[in-house]
């Protein structure tokens, strides 16, 4: 008899082969996870006189405060920083990047179109709770172009280091893969698994998918555009980059699937007009009287009948007493703040690691990418900068802000001076755009693992790339339960799909539902 596979093991295996998109879709289909296809309806018991302390002003904290305030709870939010939002952070003229050892103030032109989303930057259409709050709070949205086939793929080892258009790369890879699979249909093992009719159907699909010729060979495709002509004159196909050369691009897998699949991907996503922090300030402006800024928490004590939170503001230590506490302080920071949490809870808090994402951006003197027929999307570079993003808004304007680096594990940038960081992004960027260095004005960089009050970005639970261990699963479940029924940990750190606003919001909804059940069960 075979050993049964647990839910977690099943999702781990699925994730190893299909990525987070497959995990979430299967989890929803099998009832392991809530569907995000519909936004949650939050109904809380109203006007019960309860007081709630909310630690931090990330999107989970603001969601919590908004829903509780609408229900008549008394809420106080404590924020260590001078601004709300945590990792939902937009840089524009005058913005301070409070990175330890690399303080920067943005000096870009004071223009509403010139901004850089240094943290969260994209909203998929299936992130229904994010979209629900945008609608409720009247945050205007616009299209975010996640993929442009006219953007570039560059690797020093491919094509002599010369960049290749995304469309050339992806069309050719589709063609070569289709050609190889069509040849494999003659293999006895594969052929035996298909009927003659099924083989014919598959061959027809492969011919169309890869744009193969009558001999089922890939000889180039007009899908990649024409080398010349195509409108008034007959078009001629572009020269084909050989498969062996294409395979030298070590970021090819990202080019082929990152903007096509996944809960955070797709060619077309959304963003708020004017920057991602428009969502944050839509909440914060409505909760302004309840937020205390520059008020770092110094102690959290859970009592039988409530929670006491000590914090400092203006050099004075204050104590906030509340019936309940919702806490989105990053776990690795919270573990260093004096508290009386149970041992297993503290162990779980201290276990979660943090990502080290790095981003950089500059104001461009001209929208030079538009002269290359690029309007949004991502260029992939096999270098530490990894990605270049082009702004999809303010098309044909004078200037724009280019995201010049996005490295998910940017610890190597910590050791660099600001000058060296800038030189690194320029030298790799000019391999794609020869006038890159000339066009770049006033670059800004941000290493999230050095940001004050954050010291990291998205939480990382699993130590093993193959999935979660039983111990990690147990620690995760421990943090999802409120300490003494009074203290709730919220944010993407208490979800299985970190780094997304939708996850953080759903964590708040989960905790709010638990709170409401407890409040309703209390004796009158």
Model-based region annotation:
Residues 13, 22, 31, 71, ...:
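Conserved flavin/dinucleotide-binding core of flavoenzymes
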Residues 113-124, 265-273, 345-353, 408-419, ...:
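Active-site rim elements
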Residues 150, 157, 181-296, 304-306, ...:
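Active-site/ligand-binding neighborhood in enzyme catalytic cores
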Residues 346-372:
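Central beta-strand plus flanking loop segment that forms part of the substrate or channel wall
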Residues 327-344:
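Flavin (primarily FAD) binding-site architecture
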Residues 59, 85, 134, 283, ...:
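Generic structural signal for small/hydrophobic residues in well-ordered secondary structure
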